Amino acid sequence: MALDLEKLKFGTELIKRGFSSMTKGGVIMDVTTAEQAKIAEKAGAVAVMALERVPADIRAAGGVARMADPKKIREILDAVTIPVMAKVRIGHISEAYTLEKLGVDMLDESEVLTPADPFFHLYKKKLTVPVVSGARNLPEAVRRIFEGAAMVRTKGEAGTGNIIEAVRHIRKVNEEIAIVRRMTQDEIKTAAENIASSYFQLRNEASTDLFGQSGKVLYDDVYYGMSREKIVKGISDILRQIRKLNRLPVVNFAAGGVATPADGALMMELGADGVFVGSGIFKSPDPEKMAKSIVEAVENYKDYDVVARVSEGLQGMPGIDIESIPRDSRLQERGW
């Protein structure tokens, strides 16, 4: 039977997840100029992430961080042949559609930018372009997959050059997957109800505003036309997929604090499918050498002779101790 290409259109879950899987085992690099994008491509990056400023500069500047200038994104798109991704603010529907129209290959609904919606992330199934989202734990990852994320990544603590939070997040996801493997059907439903609860925050607040604490709350249309029951069922289905696969049903990359070849190798050793590098390359003294070295270390993460060789003579970006950052100033705290 001939394949009906008309039915296999860009934008289906199959295509979006398939595109994301093509980046497995590789390194995706943050770039702010066309020249940096060329350096990343030459170094062997599987994709680049176009943004206005790298996370370290966003952290230092403070204020409100938004999507990059479309002109800059077009310049980067024209400069390289590898896929180009772009960051969008959490929940910013209009930024997402604008970036999709520009022709980027993938979006990152990113906590590095200032969130736009205090209640909801993007409903990514409405976009034709695949979306990656950050997660500190399995409940966050499951919510993003339920919304249509084609890829998940650790949040880490972007712009610090400190790998500890990325390690924390991937270890938590791995541990929680191990727990899901042993869950009964009743336990899966209970977990799904707990994971789904963040979708009801707006309805709960609105009902309290109108009726006070004693008012009855209806959960018939709480997120893009979906009822509480439909959301819980969708999340239960994802948990059952995880139990069957013993992993997330989408690729899971490491991000947030990768600053050396050994950092990249460590995240692969812990089970990441690939690595995002933000500030770690272009905030290092020798970006070209650092870019090539991280790519080689990630591709050969079990060969420590290679990791040692590519690390020689390298100096990473200045780092920040996580404990010196107030909790409410940590980028990883953004998102729900």
UniProtKB/Swiss-Prot annotation:
Record-linked Pfam families: SOR_SNZ, ThiG
Pathway: Cofactor biosynthesis; pyridoxal 5'-phosphate biosynthesis
Amino-acid positions noted as binding D-ribose 5-phosphate in the UniProt annotation, renumbered to this chain: D30, G159, G257, G278, S279
Enzyme's top EC category: lyase
Record InterPro entries: Aldolase_TIM, PdxS/SNZ, PdxS/SNZ_N, RibuloseP-bd_barrel, Thiazole_synthase_ThiG
Protein name: Pyridoxal 5'-phosphate synthase subunit PdxS
Record EC number: 4.3.3.6
Catalytic activity: aldehydo-D-ribose 5-phosphate + D-glyceraldehyde 3-phosphate + L-glutamine = pyridoxal 5'-phosphate + L-glutamate + phosphate + 3 H2O + H(+)
Organism field: Thermoplasma volcanium (strain ATCC 51530 / DSM 4299 / JCM 9571 / NBRC 15438 / GSS1)
Gene that encodes the chain: pdxS
Keywords of this entry: Lyase, Pyridoxal phosphate, Schiff base
List of catalytic residues: K87
General function of this protein: Catalyzes the formation of pyridoxal 5'-phosphate from ribose 5-phosphate (RBP), glyceraldehyde 3-phosphate (G3P) and ammonia. The ammonia is provided by the PdxT subunit. Can also use ribulose 5-phosphate and dihydroxyacetone phosphate as substrates, resulting from enzyme-catalyzed isomerization of RBP and G3P, respectively.
Any Gene Ontology biological process: pyridoxine biosynthetic process
Subunit text: In the presence of PdxT, forms a dodecamer of heterodimers.
Binding, D-glyceraldehyde 3-phosphate: R171
Family: Belongs to the PdxS/SNZ family.
MF-aspect GO terms: pyridoxal 5'-phosphate synthase (glutamine hydrolysing) activity
Superkingdom, natural source: Archaea
